[in-house]
Amino acid sequence: MSSVIASRRYAYAFLSAAEAGGFLETVTGEMQMVGETLAASRDLQRALASPLINADRKTHLLEEIFAEAVGDKMMLFLRLIAHKKRAGILGGITQEFAALLDEKNGIVNAAVTSATELSDSQQKALSRSLEGYTGKKVRSAMKIDESLIGGLSVKIGDTIFDGSVRHQLQLLREKLVAVEA
């Protein structure tokens, strides 16, 4: 089983259990903190993924790092992950948990790239427009790329809306080349 599939299954199972048990709000913040801790430490990632370190040592490592910072339910989940020899995919589980939670809450992520910085009113108008298009709440991550020349490009999931001047010029170039041929 691929690590992405396994990560999604563990995340889904934990999300479902947390929702049914009424502790989803508590573990959401804890899961985010675990993910941030993993993302900040390559050494921790390597240790959890290492086949040379046994499950008991990984459990002990997770307990040392997180016992004071997370509640009983989250600690039980971390122990389970280590016991099942899935500690190496813990980072993926935290990402999948966040994605499933966003999906449950009707939130989509949009990567917005613009040629210049957008004003607050432009960002709000863009978000409203994207929310109207998707029917979901949009969380935008803004990035500036001057090579776009003007306009912007938006990526939501697998869909890209490219309204940049660079893209329009590229399309025009392709049409001109096709006419000449």
UniProtKB/Swiss-Prot annotation:
InterPro entries: ATP_synth_OSCP/delta_N_sf, ATPase_OSCP/dsu
Topology term for the membrane: Peripheral membrane protein
Localization terms from the record: Cell inner membrane
Domain of life: Bacteria
GO CC, one annotated term: proton-transporting ATP synthase complex
UniProt keywords, alphabetically: ATP synthesis, Cell inner membrane, Cell membrane, CF(1), Hydrogen ion transport, Ion transport, Membrane, Transport
Record carries keyword Cell membrane: yes
Pfam families: OSCP
GO molecular function annotations of the record: proton-transporting ATP synthase activity, rotational mechanism
Role description: F(1)F(0) ATP synthase produces ATP from ADP in the presence of a proton or sodium gradient. F-type ATPases consist of two structural domains, F(1) containing the extramembraneous catalytic core and F(0) containing the membrane proton channel, linked together by a central stalk and a peripheral stalk. During catalysis, ATP synthesis in the catalytic domain of F(1) is coupled via a rotary mechanism of the central stalk subunits to proton translocation.
PANTHER family the UniProt entry points to: ATP SYNTHASE DELTA CHAIN (PTHR11910)
Family note: Belongs to the ATPase delta chain family.
Assembly behavior: F-type ATPases have 2 components, F(1) - the catalytic core - and F(0) - the membrane proton channel. F(1) has five subunits: alpha(3), beta(3), gamma(1), delta(1), epsilon(1). F(0) has three main subunits: a(1), b(2) and c(10-14). The alpha and beta chains form an alternating ring which encloses part of the gamma chain. F(1) is attached to F(0) by a central stalk formed by the gamma and epsilon chains, while a peripheral stalk is formed by the delta and b chains.
NCBIfam families for the chain: ATP_synt_delta (TIGR01145)
Protein name: ATP synthase subunit delta
Native source species: Chlorobium phaeovibrioides (strain DSM 265 / 1930) (Prosthecochloris vibrioformis (strain DSM 265))
Organism taxonomic ancestry: Bacteria, Pseudomonadati, Chlorobiota, Chlorobiia, Chlorobiales
